[in-house]
Every structure is written in C-alpha cells, then in structure tokens.
C-alpha cells in the first residue's frame, strides 16, 4: 500500500475516481494494462480537486500533477470521458464546476437550487453531465454550450439525492425517502428544448426502477454492476443489498447481508459501522466495500461470499475506485466522524495493487 503522493489533505477526502481509458490507449506490449499510465482524481472537503499519475507496476511512484482550489468544499468529481485534463466537481454550496487541469482554471457550469451536489456522472452515450442534488433534482448539463446556470433538463425526485452511479447509459439513485430510482440517460434528455433549457414535454421520464429500498436505514452508497442488470447499495447500518432491475428477477434473487461490524467485549456487544463506499471490479464483476471500521472487504455477489478482507487502514474508508483494468484500487482513508474524535489520523489516499485471489469470483477459481 502506498499513499498517493504522500500529500496531506486539509480536510476529509470525499471522492476518488480514475480516468477512463480509450480502447487501445496507452497499452503495453503484453496488453495487460499494468504499465499503462493512470490518472486519478481526488476531491476533498478542503475545497481542492487534485490529480495524480501512477502505474500498477510502479505503484510506489505516484506523482502529484496539480491541485486546484475551488473555494468551496468538493463532495464529488468525475473526469469528462477519457479526457484526463477535464473534470467536473460538485460542491457543498450546490455549484457544479468544470475544472481544466491543463490551465489550472475552473468555471461554474451551473448550480442546484438548494443544498449540496451529492454526485456527478458523465455519460458518453449522450455526451451530458448528470448531477444529483439535495434539492431533489437530477440535472443534465451540456458542457459544449457556454450557458452558465442553465441545465438542459431537470428531473424531480421525491427525496434528496444522497448517492448515485452511472454505467452503460443507466443511472441509479438512492434518495432520502428510502427510494431507489433508475433511469436510462437518454430518457432524461429526450425531448429537451435546447433554447430555454426546460423539458419540452411535461410528462416526466419513466424510471426503470422506482421502488422502496430493501434496507431500513439510509443508503450511503450505490454502484451499478458490470452486467447492467442490477446494483449494490450500502447503508449506514453496516448492511449491503444486492438487487436487480427487473422486478421478477429482483423478487427471486435479491438479498442483503451484514458487514463492517465488530464485537466489543468491553461494551454492550456489536458495534455497527456505516458502509461509505462500494466499487465494482471492471473485469470480474466482484465488488469492494469500505466502512467506518477502516477495512475494505472484497465480495463475490453471485456466490454470496467474502473473498478477502484488507488489513485495517488508519481510519474510516470514505471512498473507493478501481482503475479501468482493475489492477489498482484507490482507497480514501478519511475520518467520517462515526465516533468521538480522538487523535484523528491524517486523511490520505492509498493505492492497492489487486491480487487475483481478492477479485476473482469463486466460480472462476474452481472452474
């Protein structure tokens, strides 16, 4: 394990994200992606968006490329497609900012009306940026248009958007009222009026999913699986749910399990930690969870088995991200105030080189 550049953060780390890689881009001779140069985006409550460069075969050689002060706590971020110089960040003040790492400048794309931006996702299919806010809206932005403050579409949700993920043209959203929603991205921007930025049709887009979460407590993180037929959601109650889009399949196959808990003999019994992060391995389809207990667990969702538990990190795991080939896992170790603050460790980002036994499904190991 290595810290990303050894850099200290002035406040908690909110998100980590690798830049996507175009087909054939940066591949080495044996085509395993291990020598490929990777770019990592890190956002922080200290108001910075930072960029790092690394390689799996040279995991100790992590280079800090640049850091941009946004002037507001940054809660989430994503690269714009495969452009490692362009990123978008959502902030606590509701603003959505486009960051140009090449020039070191940023501009405000727009803003949500009330409250923070909890997630930002760029969709290659529609070439739109989707943002999710505490103002109970999902907004789509056209980054090619210099129309500040004007979203090309706005979709209302019943609850605040607390967590979201996008994969292969599907958006998954967990809201404050305990609902889970899913949409096709093309449906969210279909029929928009490009002149005034409002939806041309009054009929709201029809969701793929609009159902009650199977977990009793607040959803903290959500991630779409790599097959595109379901998702994993994690809650503040140390529990993870595996669910599917189609109602018939979901009724048969959905399940939930407890994790990130420990028994404390000196107290009343079990201590339950929130699960702050979920990330799917891009090749094998297994997934990792990060909790307030400081551990990263690797899971085979189909076999319903834990594959591996990492050594304990200095403090809570606030964010996770696999590299495009799955050779690296970025791990944000950042205190999330689950317990009384006492000698709080330094907020850091670690890079872990994944091993086959940690991420390979059990069915593949035995075949």
Regions found by a protein language model. Give the residues of each.
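WD40-repeat beta-propeller superdomains and closely related acidic/aromatic-rich repeat-like regions
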Residues: 1-367
